[in-house]
Amino acid sequence: MRDDNCIFCKIANGEIPSRTLYEDEEFRVIMDLGPATRGHALILPKEHYANLFEIPADTAARAMQVAKKVGTQIVEKLGANGLNVVQNNGECAGQTVPHFHIHLIPRYQDDGQHILWKPGKLSDEEMDAIRDQILADQES
């Protein structure tokens, strides 16, 4: 299913021009117009899924295969020192377009970008309570 009001659906299906790095029947990989670093790309499924919670597991698995293939090519061809694979879900998590997508962000020494978080500290009791809450009523 596609969403006719979704800009990423339009880009993924070729209705809006993009600088395409890879395409198959399910995905289009494009260069990000506001790149974090040189070679920053986006993996877009051609079908509309708002986020990770909507995309079928097999489609998500194939998206990661595309990430490996294209990410390897980006790192090798551009001489990057590493690669961040980023997938945000929800506005508070940094998702700006409600269409599942994966960022491939090549990393270079001293590129000035930081994908970090401040480590927290929880007691053993808090960790156990959180684990129990997540696992409650879970089928084996």
Residue ranges of model-derived segments:
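HIT superfamily nucleotide-processing domains
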Residues: 1-140
